[in-house]
């Protein structure tokens, strides 16, 4: 269970990254890219960023593009946040929406 401070930092990182991703010029990062969750380590050194993409066929390419733009995003995030350390960003595909839809369909059609 993350502490209250870590929870607030996660929300702030999520909000800032959602805005920053729109400024990425990489052609692989296109369409509707949503930051669904952020999980930061207690020492604030690493942050796992869960992203969801509207077009499911491009998810792997979008994640590669975000990893490529990770240095830019980390630098801009450091400028926006007032933290001692700017966490190293790790982008991960979020499949919780698909999993939830699958479970819901199983409940509807047993």
Regions found by a protein language model. Give the residues of each.
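Charge-rich, low-complexity N-terminal segments
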Residues: 1-46, 52-110
């Amino acid at each position: 269970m993350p502490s209250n401070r870590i929870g607030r930092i996660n929300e702030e990182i999520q909000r800032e990254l959602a805005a920053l991703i729109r400024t990425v010029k990489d052609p692989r990062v296109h369409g509707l890219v949503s930051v669904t969750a952020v999980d930061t380590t207690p020492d604030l050194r690493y942050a796992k960023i869960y992203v969801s993409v509207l077009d499911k066929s491009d998810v792997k390419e979008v994640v590669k593009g975000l990893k490529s733009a990770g240095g830019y995003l980390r630098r801009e995030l450091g400028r926006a946040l007032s933290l001692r350390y700017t966490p190293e960003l790790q982008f991960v595909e979020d499949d919780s929406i698909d999993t939830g839809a699958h479970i819901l369909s199983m409940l509807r059609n047993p």
